[in-house]
Amino acid sequence: GGSAEAVVADATDEVATKELFARAGDNLDLAIYNTGNNTPGRIIDMDADFFANSWRVCCFGGFLFGREAVRQFIATQHGGTLLFTGASASLRGRANFGAFNSSKGALRNLAQAMAKEYAQDGVHVGHVVVDGPIAGEKIKRGLPEYAERLGEDGMISIDGIVDGFVYLYRQPPQAWTFELDVRTSKEKW
């Protein structure tokens, strides 16, 4: 009974983020922050720009997006749902992924702080841990041998991820979930 629109924008640009929410209008009741730059790199070989960019995309962009979503939800006085896409990196460090691990962990902490700060305003903030490779074009085109080795059962289905987001969106305020993990039955965790 509603409509949704996926928008690609520079999450690290404050003006672009404000324009995004201005364009969304007063009927906004769901906003999903889904960015990431899961690129490996050894910390001692990493330049500062690489590390800072991971933080800008994952955490700073999440701050800008979350702030504008909550401002809009509060201004319309009907609340809303703000969801952040996390990863297993949100919960634990992994060798050769220090930039990504730390920035996704920071995003999770930001989401948790926002959940506690704005629940009283009717804003449901959630964090979805996507734990494993996603069965989408990015992995199928970029790493075809890896995708073939995993098989469809070894990658998280996009429909399954969407189901998780919809589950959180539909929750009543008397039973809000903050964090939901999505993974295949084959994922070792």
Regions found by a protein language model. Name each.
Residues 120-132, 143-189:
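C-terminal helical subdomain
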